[in-house]
Each structure stands twice: as C-alpha cells, then as structure tokens.
C-alpha cells in the first residue's frame, strides 16, 4: 500500500466499505468481531481505535480496557473476558484484552513468571480457538514503533503539561529497554499465532498508514466472517454411538425414620462446611443432570435448606433465550460463575450441548463433539480458582420415570412439571442414556468427577448426594 499521499483518497472508500460490512454483520447477526489492539507505548493504540470508531456506527461498537480490579480477583481468570464478549452482530475493541497479563509476565525474567506464561499462553490459545469455532471473529492488531520515534513522542508528551499525564513510569521503563521489550513481544506474538486468530503487525510511526491499515484489517475480517456465515451447514440429529453403559452404584434404602435422622445430620454437616472461614477463599459449583423426573429439584432443595440464602444461587437451565443464542455457547454459564465464598447450583448445566442438543439435533455434530474439550477447559478454569466442582447424574429407570410422569399428570399441583417436551424426550430414553455414558466417560476428571446416583428411590438418592457433596467439599478444602 502506498503511504501518506494516498491516504485521503483511500479513506472515503474504506469508510464506505467498513460501514457496509458492519451493517451486513449486524443484520445477519451470526457472528461478532473482537478486536485486540496491543502495541508499544506511543505507537497509537488509542488514536487508532478512536479513528475506527469514528468510521463505524458507534451504536454497535464497545470498547474495553482491562486493568487491575479487586472484583476480578474474586472470579476465575477468564471470567471478565467472557463477560465482555460482543453479541453477534456487534464489534468490540479491547486494549490488550487477554494479552495484558501474558505480555507483562513475558517481560519478567524470573522463573516464576516464565512458568506463569506457559499456562497463560495455553489459556489464550484455547480461548481463541473456542471463540473462533463458536461465532467470534478474533482480530489481533499489534502496533510497532522504532526506538527513535518512540523517544521523540515521549519527549514531546512530557514537555506539554496538558499531555504529560499520558506518560507513565511503565512507559518510560519499557522505552529504556526498547530492544529487549521488542524481542519479548515478538516471541509472544509468534507463540500465540494460530490459524483461527492471526496477528496483524502494523508500523505505528506513520499515523495515516497505521489507521488505514487497521481499518482494512477490520473490514477484511468482517467480510470473511460474512462469507463463512452464509455457508452454515444444516443441523441434523446425530446417531449416538455405542459406549460403555453408565456405572450403576448400589446405595442402601432407608426407612422414613432413618431418612429424617440422616437428612438432619447431613444438612448440619453441610451447613458447617459452607460456613467455615476457609470456605470464603473457595467456592462451590454444582451441576445436576439426569432424565426428566429423576428428582433433581428435590435433591437441590435438600441442599439449599442447609445453606445461607445470601451465599448461593440456583440457576435453572432451559432452552437458550434469543440473547443467549447471540453469544458463544459457554457465555451463558460464565455469567453465573460464583465469586469466592459463594455457591452456584445449576439445575441442568453446560452439559446440555452433549445431551439434549446432541440427541435432539439442536447442535451440529462438529459443535457437540468439540464441546467435551471445551467443557473440560471451562471446569479447569473453575478449579484453578479454587472453586470446588461436583457433578451429579441422577439415574432413573424407564419404568420409574413413567410412573412419576403418570403420578404428576394426576396431581393438579404437579401437573405443570410434565409437558410435551418431556414426553418427547422419553421416547429417546435409550439415546439419552448412551449420550450420558459418553459424557461421563469423556468429562470425568480427577478434580471434577461425575457421581452417578441411582434415583429410583428418592430418599436414598438425596442422602447419597448430600453425603457425597460433604465429602467433596472436605476434600476440596483440604487440598
């Protein structure tokens, strides 16, 4: 591309292209654009983003800058980035985005920092692969600047009392070590380069060139997103492959008197565990899955009776809303991740993608097959933040499920619990069992185990869940 003399002639057409691509992206609403802007001090990050917003319709653009925030320390590392994702049809600009901590660590020569960068890089690569596969165009722009130009710009900014505030001690430190910083950043860019999210290196010395080139990058990514979104494959129900059947542990039945006594004892135990001072540094995430009428709601109520109402949230999960469908799949679950010292109880969960969406054909095969690894990474993020994860599959037999359906139909107070969707799912009982078997096999990890609970006897199942939950919390707090 020719340099400054062509700038004014290029801008009108580029602005038209950007606006047209943005309008088409918004109307189609099948993908979003997340633009990460990094760069050395005074390379023009702010000026470039401001110019791009000027060229676009700002009503459908958001800008985020992530700094240190006490609230963010209460949540897993990637929580704030997931919550800040743009909805399909929108564009978001991020100053440094999820690269801020990574590049900051890369500039530190200590052994601890080097170890930290390994996991940070892994997180970034997995996040970008996940987003790119699930409707987010990840655009990465790095603005570079030679040492002489940087030195002159810093000097000019510091000489004017109206702009002096823009130069931080970090800027000066990085400028003094320009060569080393540049090499470290180059290593970061190379390590985080991947097919789904490539880096665009733009020279920042020439303001006109920098802005036009950045605009072209954003335009081209939107056009590519529009082209690919038009080729969406038709979703069909998938045949469920044969896998090992679900484990069927045996739990003893109890009398009514035994149930009442044991329930009181276990609820007291749970109440004490979740009120311990140490628990404030942890947190708890519970996922309940199972066939319809398996007793998930009743089990959850026996848990919440032991908890402080200010401490927990029950999250009922049903078919995604229009808003939830306009984000990557896991976004809706990241929203409800609890802070330290709190509890989130999911009545159905992120496993819906490999259960109902798979069996009923609501998700494309490529999406649910990819979901196993994405779910394991999601749970790993929770565990690394000291959130204790417990997952329960309530296993009810076909005959017992039918008995409960009929019982509910005959009870006016319970009739609302059974709808046509439940009966439709019942005809696919065997397919759900096979899908659940593969789910347990592929997502059962050492720290986030599946607990398969025989649920034909509700009282025995509730006691078993409470007992298992208390043991899981005790293990988590002692780790």
Which residues are covered by each model-predicted region?
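Glycine-rich phosphate-binding loop of ATP-dependent small-molecule kinases
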Residues: 1-479
């Amino acid at each position: 591309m020719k340099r400054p003399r062509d700038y004014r002639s290029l801008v009108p057409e580029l602005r038209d292209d950007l606006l047209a691509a943005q309008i088409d992206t918004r109307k189609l609403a099948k993908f979003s654009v997340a633009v990460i802007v990094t760069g050395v001090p005074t390379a023009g990050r702010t000026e470039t983003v401001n110019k791009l917003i000027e060229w676009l319709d700002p009503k459908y653009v958001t800008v985020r800058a992530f700094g240190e925030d006490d609230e963010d320390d209460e949540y897993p590392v990637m929580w704030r980035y997931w919550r800040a994702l743009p909805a399909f049809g929108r564009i978001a600009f991020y100053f440094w985005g999820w690269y801020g901590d990574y590049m900051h660590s890369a500039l530190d020569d200590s052994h601890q920092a080097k170890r930290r960068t390994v996991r940070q890089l892994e997180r970034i690569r997995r996040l970008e692969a996940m987003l790119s596969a699930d409707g987010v165009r990840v655009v990465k722009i790095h603005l570079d600047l030679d040492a002489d130009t940087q030195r002159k710009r810093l000097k000019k900014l510091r000489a004017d009392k109206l702009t002096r505030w823009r130069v931080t001690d970090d800027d000066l430190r990085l400028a003094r070590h320009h060569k080393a910083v540049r090499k470290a950043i180059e290593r970061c860019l190379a390590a985080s380069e991947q097919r789904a999210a490539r880096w665009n290196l733009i020279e920042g010395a020439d303001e006109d060139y920098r802005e036009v080139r950045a605009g072209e990058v954003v335009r081209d990514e939107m056009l590519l997103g529009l082209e690919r979104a038009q080729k969406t494959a038709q979703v069909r129900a998938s045949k469920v492959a044969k896998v090992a059947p679900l484990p069927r542990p045996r739990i003893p039945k109890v009398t009514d008197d035994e149930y009442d006594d044991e329930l009181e004892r276990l609820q007291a135990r749970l109440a004490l565990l979740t009120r311990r001072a140490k628990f404030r540094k942890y947190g708890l995430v519970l996922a309940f899955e199972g066939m319809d009428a398996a007793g998930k709601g009743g089990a959850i109520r026996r848990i919440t009776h032991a908890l402080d109402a200010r401490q927990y949230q029950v999250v009922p999960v049903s078919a995604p809303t229009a808003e939830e469908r306009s984000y990557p799949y896991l976004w809706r679950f990241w929203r409800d991740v609890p802070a330290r010292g709190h509890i989130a109880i999911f009545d159905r969960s992120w496993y819906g993608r490999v259960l109902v969406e798979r069996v009923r054909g609501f998700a494309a095969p490529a999406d649910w097959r990819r979901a196993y690894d994405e779910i394991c990474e999601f749970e790993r993020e929770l565990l690394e933040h000291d959130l204790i994860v417990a997952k329960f599959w309530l296993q009810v037999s076909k005959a017992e499920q039918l008995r409960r359906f009929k019982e509910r139909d005959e009870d006016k107070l319970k009739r609302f619990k059974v709808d046509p969707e439940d009966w439709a799912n019942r005809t696919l009982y065997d397919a759900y069992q096979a899908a659940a078997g593969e789910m347990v096999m592929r997502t059962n990890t050492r720290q986030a185990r599946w607990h398969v609970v025989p649920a034909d006897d509700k009282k025995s199942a509730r006691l078993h869940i409470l007992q298992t939950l208390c043991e899981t919390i005790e293990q988590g707090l002692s780790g």
